[in-house]
Design a protein with these regions (language model features):
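His/Asp/Glu-rich mid-to-C-terminal helical/loop segments that flank catalytic regions of hydrolases
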Residues: 114, 243-287
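Soluble metallo-hydrolase cores and metallopeptidase-like ectodomains found primarily
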Residues: 6-98, 114, 118-122
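Active-site alpha-helical elements of protease catalytic centers
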Residues: 100-114
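Short, small-residue-biased leader/transition segments that mark boundaries at the very start
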Residues: 1-2
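Metal-dependent peptidase/peptidase-like ectodomains
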Residues: 135-241
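Short helix-loop-beta-strand segments that form the rim/entrance of peptidase-like active sites
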Residues: 111-141, 162-165
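Structural recognition of the beta-strand scaffold that forms the well-ordered cores
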Residues: 32, 64-68, 78-82, 131-134, ...
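Solvent-exposed loop/turn segments at secondary-structure junctions
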Residues: 38, 60, 73-74, 85-89, ...
Length: 287
């Protein structure tokens, strides 16, 4: 499947949304909203669109894509698994594919969705419901997740955590000699239970090196605030941000498929699945 642009404000992004919907094979929903361009490359979300103002110059539609695997006895509680499916489109005629940012996270989320759907079909439904959200507009200021938390399709109080996946397909400079790692950010900021659960699940399954370098409040890059999970955390919802870190191809046209490490991408995806499965099926919530 080829797409000419992954910029959230290009009509091609709607084709990507449809592809995500068709590929996950679970109940899904498109959350459409409008954004307005100003100053040439800046965008803002329109929270009160009307039949008239959506026809204004610079106004364009975009969509979050949501998928649901309904739980059983605790189905009114939700585990959110998120990624963003937009990138930065093209510059001077050059396509920026964003294979890692965030193609890797989007594919991981879709694989996890299919795994939960398969488990449910085989009679192993999770106790809590799993809400998968592919956000749009992350690169332009977390627009999709910001819109969602202000217009949630389920009450925010029913969401027990967000597991956010953004760039998990590469090996950064700090781990050239040890590829089996993943950075975890934010697991202990709101819920101590989530942090302990995450570490225990890792020890009993993939046993990756969990690197907390970017979790430090003194981290100069402040990655905790730079992806869609922060809009959930700002509403008191526990989160984990999974990433493999930055690399020289970040936001460059060289962020391409051939540079993805599929072996470690698979392991990181499996870890997130096991973590989500444990959260969805445990007796207690997260404190």
């Amino acid at each position: 499947m080829l797409f000419r642009s992954n910029h959230f404000a290009n009509n091609e992004i709607l084709k990507i949304a449809n592809w995500i919907n068709d590929s996950t094979q679970i109940y899904s929903y498109f959350q459409k909203f409008y954004v307005k361009e100003y100053y040439g490359s800046q965008f803002s979300t329109m929270y009160n669109p009307t039949a008239e103002n959506i026809k204004s110059k610079g106004v364009m539609p975009t969509e979050n894509v949501l998928g649901l695997v309904e739980g059983t006895d605790k189905k009114e509680e939700f585990v959110v698994i998120s990624a963003h499916y937009d990138h930065i489109g093209t510059k001077n005629g050059t396509i920026y594919n964003g294979a890692d940012d965030d193609g890797s996270g989007t594919v991981a989320m879709m694989e996890i969705a299919q795994a939960f759907a398969k488990a449910k079909k085989e009679g192993h439904s999770p106790r809590r419901s799993i809400l998968f959200i592919a956000f749009t507009g992350e690169e332009q200021g977390l627009l999709g997740s910001s819109y969602y938390v202000q217009n949630p399709l389920i009450p925010l109080k029913n969401i027990i955590c967000d597991l956010n996946i953004d760039m998990i397909g590469r090996i950064d400079r700090e781990h050239k000699k040890m590829h089996d790692y993943v950075y975890l950010i934010g697991a202990d900021r709101i819920s101590k239970d989530l942090h302990k659960l995450s570490e225990n699940i890792n020890l009993s399954t993939l046993n990756l090196k969990l690197d907390y370098t970017y979790n430090a409040e003194s981290d100069p890059l402040q990655l905790y605030y730079r992806s869609d999970h922060i809009n959930f955390a700002s509403n008191g919802i526990p989160i984990i941000f999974y990433t493999s870190g930055l690399h020289p191809d970040y936001h460059e046209s060289t962020d391409d498929l051939e540079k993805i490490d599929f072996d470690i991408l698979q392991k990181r995806t499996q870890l997130i699945f096991h973590t989500a499965w444990e959260i969805a099926n445990r007796e207690e919530g997260l404190k």
